[in-house]
Amino acid sequence: MALQKVDISLSTEQLLQAQVHVWNHMYAFANSMSLKCAIQLGIPDILHKHGRPMTLSQLLQSIPINKEKTQCFQRLMRALVNSNFFIEENNSNNQEVCYWLTPASCLLLKEAPLTVTPLVQVVLDPTFTNPWHHMSEWFTHEKHATQFEAANGCTFWEKLANEPSKGRFFDEAMSCDSRLIAHVFTKDYKHVIEGIRTLVDVGGGNGTMAKAIVEAMPTIKCTVIDLPHVVAGLESTDNLNYIGGDMFQSIPSADAILLKSIIHDWDDVEGLKILKKCKDAVVMGGKVIIIDVVVGVNHDIDEVLEDQLHFDMAMMCYFNAKERTMSEWEKLIYDAGFKSYKLTPAFGVRSLIEAYP
């Protein structure tokens, strides 16, 4: 029996719009690489140090651009303006356009307290971009558990453990992310931890989040538990303690257990194990505080849903893990034995979940 042809005839307008859509996604990486270049050239920092908008000529005097490529630099700036990393302003003294920072590029200032530059540099490093080229191979072969393993010959965590420089690179990226989240958490959601005496930050790295919590609320005693090589050499204080351990084996008891961007690194089987360990560690009347993506929450905010889906694909790429919808979170929470939970759309792309045993 002959296959019936499907009519996919398009009007000229539909045809050209379809081409635009394909091309837009085909070259989407150009935005990422232009962003990476802006950071490497230090453009945001140069503008910030200057203290006011700069003309192209002024920027070129501050950056060692090859003279033959000055016109190309103008095109880079045009692309970055289009991506809303810089704005153009008219220069009243002459006709040359001036460039200035946007809220997004303020997050790219290397010395800014809430900089996200280390995270951008990690995500766009070849070690972490190469695995994306193995997606179709990973889907069709059983050999590798993850795309990351297909590209690097080892798991994500093995790579960081075997190459200390990569490990430090990644830890700083996580720290910068924690600084931003901690800033919002202690500023706008301090009530979530009011009345809590003890808190354990599971997988808390070098303690960036915990430090912010004890600084904002000195009466809380925080413990950070992470792998021994992560916390090695970190000094404890009166209200901040570091423990080298394994969250799959044991978690210290506390009034509250914090999981910031932890469960999304794991599939449902491992995620359930972690949540059960956290539930067992919470004292009576306590709770588990989860800061993670809930796919679909805040979807009406510009770019949020797309970011959530990007995160989900990244978790699949690196760990064969995932970001979860609210129904998936709910199942995981109840399967772990929690009786109730509260969801707060608190952090843009991410949400705050309080789970109660």
From Swiss-Prot:
Q: What residues does S-adenosyl-L-methionine bind to? A: 203, 226, 246-247, 260
Question: In which tissues does this protein get expressed?
Answer: Specifically expressed in the peltate glandular trichomes on the surface of the young basil leaves.
Give the pathway annotation. Aromatic compound metabolism; phenylpropanoid biosynthesis
Q: What is its EC number?
A: 2.1.1.146
Gene Ontology MF, one: (iso)eugenol O-methyltransferase activity
> Which SUPFAM superfamilies does the UniProt record give?
S-adenosyl-L-methionine-dependent methyltransferases, Winged helix' DNA-binding domain
A Pfam family per the record: Dimerisation
Result when mutating residue 261 to F: Induces a substrate preference for chavicol
Active site per UniProt? 264
Alphabetical GO biological process terms: methylation; phenylpropanoid biosynthetic process
UniProt-listed InterPro entries: COMT-like (IPR016461), O_MeTrfase_dom (IPR001077), Plant_O-MeTrfase_dimerisation (IPR012967), SAM-dependent_MTases_sf (IPR029063), WH-like_DNA-bd_sf (IPR036388), WH_DNA-bd_sf (IPR036390)
- Keywords of this protein's UniProt record, alphabetized? Methyltransferase, S-adenosyl-L-methionine, Transferase
Q: Which reaction equation describes what this protein catalyses?
A: (E)-isoeugenol + S-adenosyl-L-methionine = (E)-isomethyleugenol + S-adenosyl-L-homocysteine + H(+)
Function text: Phenylpropene O-methyltransferase that catalyzes the methylation of the para-4-hydroxyl of eugenol to methyleugenol. Can also convert chavicol to methylchavicol but with less affinity.
Concerning its family, UniProt says: Belongs to the class I-like SAM-binding methyltransferase superfamily. Cation-independent O-methyltransferase family. COMT subfamily.
Supply the name of the protein.
Eugenol O-methyltransferase
